[in-house]
């Protein structure tokens, strides 16, 4: 089961949190559609800012958006002009009070989406897929990853027949729930067609904190 299911959804509530934190009853469809519009707008507006995750939290007429990016300076801009302009545009889009929080990704080579986008950009620049995947996996391992697995699928190197190839380094235990597995799927638009890139990164194990049990008193003890 762990081999087939999305590792991010498989670990929700265990060592991963939801990217959308809100509750809606009758207006669920409208709220979800608004979330999709927000994410699409941010991904198009900040296409070159290495944005990985967008977290949306709602409370009454207020929307809190956390943008995880490897280039916070590009998102914030000089004196905060860029992020303020983005906030106003999102407020106009949603007609709600929007607050934006920028979270820096300190190790982008351990983020599956950013690694996948880097491979996709190289494939679009006609770099050989084996070279692109090998370099990406080596950078991730040097950054502290316990393991990484990359799958590329499509007309690789312009071949007439589409195929699927894997490149793995280290250990990627998909069945182990305590393992911090980051997963992403990205598409590269090449002249030969679309090439899918899937990335799994094992960032180590997250062990639950043990509660200290009260020591049992021995008979006759003080």
UniProtKB/Swiss-Prot annotation:
<dbReference type="GO" id="GO:0003729">
    <property type="term" value="F:mRNA binding"/>
</dbReference>
<comment type="subunit">
    <text>Part of the 30S ribosomal subunit. Forms a tight complex with proteins S10 and S14.</text>
</comment>
<dbReference type="InterPro" id="IPR015946">
    <property type="entry name" value="KH_dom-like_a/b"/>
</dbReference>
<dbReference type="GO" id="GO:0022627">
    <property type="term" value="C:cytosolic small ribosomal subunit"/>
</dbReference>
<dbReference type="InterPro" id="IPR009019">
    <property type="entry name" value="KH_sf_prok-type"/>
</dbReference>
<dbReference type="GO" id="GO:0003735">
    <property type="term" value="F:structural constituent of ribosome"/>
</dbReference>
<comment type="function">
    <text>Binds the lower part of the 30S subunit head. Binds mRNA in the 70S ribosome, positioning it for translation.</text>
</comment>
<keyword id="KW-0699">rRNA-binding</keyword>
<protein>
    <recommendedName>
        <fullName>Small ribosomal subunit protein uS3</fullName>
    </recommendedName>
</protein>
<feature type="domain" description="KH type-2">
    <location>
        <begin position="38"/>
        <end position="106"/>
    </location>
</feature>
<dbReference type="InterPro" id="IPR036419">
    <property type="entry name" value="Ribosomal_S3_C_sf"/>
</dbReference>
<dbReference type="InterPro" id="IPR005704">
    <property type="entry name" value="Ribosomal_uS3_bac-typ"/>
</dbReference>
<dbReference type="GO" id="GO:0019843">
    <property type="term" value="F:rRNA binding"/>
</dbReference>
<dbReference type="InterPro" id="IPR018280">
    <property type="entry name" value="Ribosomal_uS3_CS"/>
</dbReference>
<comment type="similarity">
    <text>Belongs to the universal ribosomal protein uS3 family.</text>
</comment>
<keyword id="KW-0689">Ribosomal protein</keyword>
<keyword id="KW-0687">Ribonucleoprotein</keyword>
<dbReference type="Pfam" id="PF07650">
    <property type="entry name" value="KH_2"/>
</dbReference>
<dbReference type="InterPro" id="IPR001351">
    <property type="entry name" value="Ribosomal_uS3_C"/>
</dbReference>
<keyword id="KW-0694">RNA-binding</keyword>
<dbReference type="InterPro" id="IPR004044">
    <property type="entry name" value="KH_dom_type_2"/>
</dbReference>
<dbReference type="Pfam" id="PF00189">
    <property type="entry name" value="Ribosomal_S3_C"/>
</dbReference>
<dbReference type="GO" id="GO:0006412">
    <property type="term" value="P:translation"/>
</dbReference>
<dbReference type="InterPro" id="IPR004087">
    <property type="entry name" value="KH_dom"/>
</dbReference>
């Amino acid at each position: 089961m762990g081999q087939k299911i999305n590792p991010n959804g498989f670990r929700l509530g265990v060592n991963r949190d939801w990217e959308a934190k809100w509750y809606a009853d009758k207006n669920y469809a409208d709220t979800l559609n608004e979330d999709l519009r927000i994410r699409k707008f941010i991904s198009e507006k900040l296409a070159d800012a290495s944005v990985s995750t967008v977290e949306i939290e709602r409370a009454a007429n207020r929307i809190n958006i956390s943008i995880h990016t490897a280039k916070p300076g590009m998102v914030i801009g000089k004196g905060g002009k860029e992020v303020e302009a983005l906030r106003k545009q999102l407020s106009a889009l949603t007609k709600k009070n929007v607050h934006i929080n920028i979270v820096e990704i300190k190790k982008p080579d351990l983020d599956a989406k950013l690694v996948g986008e880097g491979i996709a950009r190289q494939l679009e620049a006609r770099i050989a897929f084996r070279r692109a995947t090998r370099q990406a996996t080596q950078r991730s391992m040097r950054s502290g990853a316990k393991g990484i697995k990359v799958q590329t699928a499509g007309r690789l190197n312009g071949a007439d027949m589409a195929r699927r190839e894997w490149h793995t380094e280290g250990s990627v235990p998909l069945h182990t729930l305590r393992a911090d597995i980051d997963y992403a799927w990205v598409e590269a638009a090449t002249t030969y067609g679309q090439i899918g890139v899937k990335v799994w990164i094992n960032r180590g194990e997250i062990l639950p904190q043990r509660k200290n049990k009260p020591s049992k008193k021995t008979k006759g003890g003080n």
